Amino acid sequence: MKFSFRFASVLKVRRYQKRKEKQKLGMLLNQKRMIEQQIRDLKKKCQHAFEQPQKQSALANRQYYAQKHSQHERLTQLKKQHRVLGNKVEEQRGKLTEAVKKMRMMEKLKKREKRAFVERVEHMDQLQQNEIAIQRYNSDY
């Protein structure tokens, strides 16, 4: 007799869902890391590139402040994207946790059914051995 799990296809789907949720989380974390790197780079750029010389013309002054303003707007935009991605990451972690929970539940069910199957087979084997022993005992007398 061979054990076959009656919900094998469901378990397979649960494992697939877990793998997909894990991939989605990985992509979101990569995006978040990229934005964090962009923020760090932009902050460094702002610190080094915008050291204003003492004497500048009005045009150079205006360009300097316009560039500084655009860099700060970009920094604000990146921080906003970072917050949004942080929320998406937390949401995705919740989905992954749920997928893992469902998969583990199916694996536990499979384990229980397999244990019950093994016990049933062992019980049937024991009954057969007992029957054989009884027949041998009765045939001797």
Region spans (language model):
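Charge-rich amphipathic alpha-helical interaction elements
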Residues: 1-141
